[in-house]
């Protein structure tokens, strides 16, 4: 029988499709109904930006704050030095402390778009687990914390078991990650009264570890809640596109390309994505998702505008839509297209089309460029390019050259 939550937060989670599992739904619902509940999601600083795959959990934190509770974004300045082994086929490369700090700063910019930070009861709080993990005494930690963990149980977690079943090495360093993440929950409960950890369903084992540890050490009543691991209707993992990761930082992915990612949503995903990634009413999301034929394209544009507005602002969303209209409907250039600067010296007396595309970073290899041309997938200033060996000179580029790769990828190349 489906449980019907009383609290606004759990009701939103259930209605909009954010909820996969919860350790104790009724007890958490009671706690959320009685007062402010601090809740956190942890983010290891493995890249300079978060990507679209992180956005679902960020929206959960946003809804948590909108429904009167306190979101905590926990930066993994300490755990990133170890690396989360969950469902990975190999050990992560270790990052330097300076790189970790740079990555955290890049992530901070994204969170500031979705959450309101401050000193109030429901203002968001950003913490770094390096504050306590860097201070740990190893022997004390083994005695006080390590004794609460069963290696037998840890080996049974699917995230670890799948790695071992493939006979791939799991280092002692990575194995410790689970204990450190569990300790984070204990420390957050001690410092802030945090009572809820959220994350993707692949984090279930780590979350349960933290709950068990905190109950054993501090006898705290705390909870875990996970979201489904999201894939598109055609089976692709969220966060990736044909061109690579869909980054949330504007410096790493232009707002136009971010907008275009959402505009290209498969028809079957429109209603679901509207519920997960926008704040439109559920009934409106369902209505838009049920549209057919050409009408669904208007819903996709609305989806792209709403998601881009949350991240980059309304002006950026409107500029992206105007550019898309100019590019696709009017054959123009559009002011929001990403500009690629190519040193004039690189072009020299001229390069073949294939070498030009590689030099500008628009394709990964000459082989890919030749395949693109052979499949009639390349245009310069809206004109088809029929020969990968055609020379590209400074005169070809002029003030700027619009390069279209397929129907959906468009860049402006300028010489510098």
UniProtKB/Swiss-Prot annotation:
Its EC number is 6.1.1.1. The keyword RNA-binding applies. It catalyses: tRNA(Tyr) + L-tyrosine + ATP = L-tyrosyl-tRNA(Tyr) + AMP + diphosphate + H(+). SUPFAM superfamilies: Alpha-L RNA-binding motif, Nucleotidylyl transferase. It is an enzyme of class 6 (ligase). One of its GO terms (cellular component) is cytosol. The keyword Ribonucleoprotein does not apply. It is found in: Cytoplasm. Pfam families: tRNA-synt_1b. ATP binds at residue 240. Keywords: Aminoacyl-tRNA synthetase, ATP-binding, Cytoplasm, Ligase, Nucleotide-binding, Protein biosynthesis, RNA-binding. GO terms for molecular function: ATP binding; RNA binding; tyrosine-tRNA ligase activity. A motif ('KMSKS' region) lies at residues 237-241. Its main location: cytoplasm. Residues 351-416 form the S4 RNA-binding domain. Belongs to the class-I aminoacyl-tRNA synthetase family. TyrS type 1 subfamily. Catalyzes the attachment of tyrosine to tRNA(Tyr) in a two-step reaction: tyrosine is first activated by ATP to form Tyr-AMP and then transferred to the acceptor end of tRNA(Tyr). This is Tyrosine--tRNA ligase. It comes from Cereibacter sphaeroides (strain ATCC 17023 / DSM 158 / JCM 6121 / CCUG 31486 / LMG 2827 / NBRC 12203 / NCIMB 8253 / ATH 2.4.1.) (Rhodobacter sphaeroides). The gene is tyrS.
């Amino acid at each position: 029988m489906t449980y019907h939550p009383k609290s606004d937060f759990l009701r939103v989670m259930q209605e909009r499709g954010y909820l996969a599992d919860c350790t104790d739904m009724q007890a958490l619902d009671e706690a959320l109904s009685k007062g402010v509940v601090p809740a956190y999601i942890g983010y290891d600083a493995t890249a300079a930006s978060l990507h679209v795959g992180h956005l679902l959990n960020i929206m959960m934190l946003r809804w948590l704050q909108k429904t009167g509770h306190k979101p905590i974004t926990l930066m993994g300045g300490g755990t990133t030095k170890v690396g989360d082994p969950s469902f990975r086929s190999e050990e992560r490369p270790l990052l330097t402390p300076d790189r970790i700090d740079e990555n955290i700063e890049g992530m901070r910019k994204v969170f500031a778009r979705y959450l309101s930070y401050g000193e109030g009861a429901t203002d968001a709080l950003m913490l770094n687990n390096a504050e306590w993990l860097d201070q740990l005494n190893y022997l004390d930690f083994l005695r006080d914390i390590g004794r609460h963990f069963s290696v037998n149980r840890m080996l049974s977690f699917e995230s670890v078991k799948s790695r071992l079943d493939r006979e791939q090495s799991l280092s002692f360093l990575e194995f410790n990650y689970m204990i450190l993440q569990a300790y984070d929950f204990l420390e957050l409960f001690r410092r802030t009264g945090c009572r809820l950890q959220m994350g993707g369903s692949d984090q279930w084992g780590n979350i349960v570890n933290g709950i068990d540890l905190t109950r054993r050490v501090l006898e705290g009543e705390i909870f875990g809640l996970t979201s489904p691991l999201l894939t598109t209707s055609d089976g692709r993992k969220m966060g990736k596109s044909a061109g690579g990761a869909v980054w949330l930082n504007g410096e790493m992915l232009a707002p136009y390309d971010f907008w275009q990612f959402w505009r290209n949503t498969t028809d079957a995903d429109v209603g679901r994505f509207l519920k997960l990634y926008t704040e439109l009413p559920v009934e409106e999301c369902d209505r838009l998702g049920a549209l057919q034929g050409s009408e669904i394209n208007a819903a996709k544009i609305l989806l792209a505008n709403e998601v881009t507005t949350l991240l980059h602002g309304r002006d950026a969303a409107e500029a992206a839509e105007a550019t898309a209209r100019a590019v696709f409907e009017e054959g123009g250039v559009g002011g929001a297209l990403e500009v690629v600067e190519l040193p004039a010296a690189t072009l020299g007396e001229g390069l073949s089309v294939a070498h030009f595309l590689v030099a500008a970073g628009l394709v990964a290899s000459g082989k890919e460029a030749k395949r693109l041309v052979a499949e009639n997938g390349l245009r310069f200033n809206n004109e088809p390019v029929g020969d990968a060996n055609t020379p590209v000179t400074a005169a070809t580029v002029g003030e700027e050259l619009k390069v279209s790769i397929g129907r959906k990828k468009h860049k402006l190349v300028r010489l510098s």
